[in-house]
């Protein structure tokens, strides 16, 4: 008599966008799994997300319903003729380059429609497409190790679980990264500062238009030596602003975010167009400084 085939036990570590996208795909294909999430609930931390053509295609492949729900929360460029433009690339100098004889360059494709959403709104629609009872909250993985043909996950609360496969969606500081890289690439386990940090904020569309006028209607990238501003539409009548600074120095702080004064922030963009400085000004006190690393992990 043949033994019954037991379905594999699959663990997903992390309930962010990557982990939930995987859960949706596995659910659609009737594959059982458990998500282990360190937080006590789905996180609302984050700002805007602009999705490129590969991400949009992936949504449909994961589950066509995900794309349909995303269309309901996402927002694109306001100008119909710029629907397929990812961003107008302009200069951050006074006049946005027009005074220098360069009026910018649109970057996009007829096969791509620009869109963006708030991270929380995206997570909210994703949780509709899989059984949330598959998520165990308050489970911070501290170690992932191979044990013969199985994998053992050790959690901070003392519990250990044995599974057939682990898919890590727990980020640059996660236990999965250490498990994969420590033996052969120990120098690459810790995240390394790229020399760039960013300020990011969600701004009401009315305030962005007061500062920038029609320039706030569509996706923009304002570039300058050692700095840039990225601006795009997202859900809820808001815009996402990311202001980046490249200094190539050392990050000496313990945390990945750092409080700064208004004066310190504005000094980072001295010499830029006054409208961009005004836009930064209306964001106070909601703006935070975040470092950027050389690591991209689901």
What is each of the regions a protein language model found here?
Residues 27-47:
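Glycine-rich FAD pyrophosphate-binding loop
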Residues 291-298:
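FAD-binding beta-loop-beta segment adjacent to the flavin cofactor pocket
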Residues 10-12, 20-22, 29, 141:
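A generic "structured core" feature
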Residues 18, 41, 173:
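Conserved Rossmann-like nucleotide-cofactor binding loop
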Residues 66-67, 111-284:
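Conserved FAD-binding catalytic core of PHBH/FMO-like flavoproteins
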Residues 2-18:
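Beta1/beta-strand and adjacent pyrophosphate-binding region of the FAD-binding site
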Residues 46-129:
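Active-site-adjacent segment of FAD-dependent monooxygenases/related oxidoreductases
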Residues 9, 32, 238:
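Residues at the starts of beta-strands that form the adenosine-phosphate
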């Amino acid at each position: 008599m043949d033994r019954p085939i037991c379905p594999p036990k699959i663990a997903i570590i992390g309930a962010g966008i990557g982990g939930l996208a995987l859960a949706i795909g596995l659910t659609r294909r009737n594959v059982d799994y458990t998500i282990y999430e360190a937080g006590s609930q789905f996180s609302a931390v984050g700002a805007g997300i602009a999705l490129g053509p590969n991400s949009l295609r992936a949504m449909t492949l994961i589950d066509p319903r995900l794309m349909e729900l995303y269309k309901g929360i996402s927002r694109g460029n306001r100008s119909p003729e710029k629907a397929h433009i990812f961003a107008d690339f302009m200069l951050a100098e006074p006049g946005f380059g027009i005074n220098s004889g360069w009026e910018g360059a649109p970057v996009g494709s007829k096969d791509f429609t620009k869109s963006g959403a708030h991270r929380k709104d995206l997570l909210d629609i994703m949780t509709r497409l899989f059984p949330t009872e598959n998520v165990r909250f308050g489970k911070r993985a501290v170690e992932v190790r191979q044990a013969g043909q199985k994998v053992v996950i050790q959690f901070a609360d003392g519990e250990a679980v044995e599974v057939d496969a682990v898919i890590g969606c727990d980020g640059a500081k996660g236990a999965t990264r250490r498990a994969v890289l420590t033996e052969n690439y120990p120098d690459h386990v810790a995240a390394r500062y790229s020399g760039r940090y960013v300020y990011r904020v969600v701004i009401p569309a009315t305030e962005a238009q007061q500062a920038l006028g029609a320039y706030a209607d569509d996706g923009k990238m304002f570039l300058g030596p050692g700095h840039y501003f990225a601006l795009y539409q997202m859900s809820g009548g808001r815009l996402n602003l990311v202001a980046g600074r490249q200094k190539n120095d050392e990050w000496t702080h313990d945390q990945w975010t750092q409080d700064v004064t208004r004066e310190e922030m504005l000094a980072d963009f001295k010499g830029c167009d006054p409208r961009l400085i005004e836009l930064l000004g209306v964001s106070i006190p909601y703006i935070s400084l975040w470092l950027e690393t050389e690591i991209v992990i689901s």
